[in-house]
Amino acid sequence: APIDLAIVYAASIMAEACPTLRDVFLNMLGDRSMIAKVDDREAVYGKGYIGWVNKRRVLVGNRSLMQDYGVKLPSLEYEQHHTVNQRRMIYLAVSGKLFAMFQVAYQRDPDTAAVLDSLRHSGQSLIVDCDDFNCDTALLEAAYSLPAGAVKVLNTAEHELMNPATAWLPESDGNMLHLGSFASFVGGLEAAAGAA
């Protein structure tokens, strides 16, 4: 069935990419042994992912990625009708043709909401550099009821400018290693700010 194949394609591309969407597709797939080998996987910041599966170019991403590759899509009005609130469309194209569309809904995380509220009340704003091609300022403002200006998601040019500043260095003036939740990460930042 085409939808089963669509899930295999999408899960295969996402299996080694996009942490926020990976499990959605892997859970739809169910049997991880069905993941296909992906050659030359590439992230296109803010747009999606490209790779080759069984000698076919597979694109998983947003409208902008599909337009960059000349994939014919439903009208923008159709997309806007199906993406109210925190819903977003994920497009899958195979060999240059639209193969499937997935609608995903983003939900607020209570721990993240509490941390964002704490940051906002202390007068801090947040800059986000995200692997999720659907993540934008409007989505975060809506999901977390944030006022305009409380959060900024980096665009492609800003992401590229930040790369040298955020690259790993063998030695630096200060750093924080973080392997936990977003809430604990921000807790570490607040502790560092309080110690300064």
Predicted features along the sequence, with ranges:
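ATP-binding catalytic core of ATPases
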Residues: 2-45, 67-69, 76-78
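Short conserved beta-strand segments at catalytic cores or DNA/RNA-binding microdomains
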Residues: 15, 88-95
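ATP-binding glycine-rich phosphate-binding loop
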Residues: 41-48, 64, 82-85
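Conserved ATP-binding TGD loop and adjacent catalytic N/P-domain core of P-type ATPases
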Residues: 53-55, 94-196
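Surface loops and adjacent helix of pleckstrin homology
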Residues: 62-63, 70-72, 104
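Helix-loop-beta junctions that constitute the ligand-sensing/allosteric loops
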Residues: 84-91, 124-125
